């Protein structure tokens, strides 16, 4: 019973990975639209996009960490 609950909890924690994938897609789609509107700001916008990517990917890594904690610690 406890093993099943752990698996369900870990699966629920990894749902955040789908949200992170959508967020990363939004970051880079916004970058493409912004560079298409104003190509002279491409270098500055790329820096912002990489920052947005890193922050969004951190959410997925935290979710993965929580899934491992649920599976192997609790």
From Swiss-Prot:
One of its GO terms (cellular component) is proton-transporting ATP synthase complex. It holds the Pfam family ATP-synt_C. It is a multi-pass membrane protein. One of its GO terms (biological process) is proton motive force-driven ATP synthesis. One of its GO terms (molecular function) is lipid binding. SUPFAM superfamilies: F1F0 ATP synthase subunit C (SSF81333). It is found in: Mitochondrion membrane. The keyword Metal-binding does not apply. The record marks 57 as: Reversibly protonated during proton transport. The chain crosses the membrane at residues 8-28, 45-72. Keywords: ATP-binding, CF(0), Hydrogen ion transport, Ion transport, Lipid-binding, Membrane, Mitochondrion, Nucleotide-binding, Transmembrane, Transmembrane helix, Transport. Its main location: mitochondrion. CDD domains: ATP-synt_Fo_c_ATP5G3 (cd18182). InterPro entries: ATP_synth_F0_csu, ATP_synth_F0_csu_DDCD_BS, ATP_synth_F0_csu_sf, ATPase_proteolipid_c-like_dom, F/V-ATP_Csub_sf. The keyword Acetylation does not apply. PANTHER family: ATP SYNTHASE LIPID-BINDING PROTEIN, MITOCHONDRIAL, ATPASE PROTEIN 9. HAMAP family: ATP_synth_c_bact. F-type ATPases have 2 components, CF(1) - the catalytic core - and CF(0) - the membrane proton channel. CF(1) has five subunits: alpha(3), beta(3), gamma(1), delta(1), epsilon(1). CF(0) has three main subunits: a, b and c. Belongs to the ATPase C chain family. This protein is one of the chains of the nonenzymatic membrane component (F0) of mitochondrial ATPase. This is ATP synthase subunit 9, mitochondrial. It comes from Glycine max.
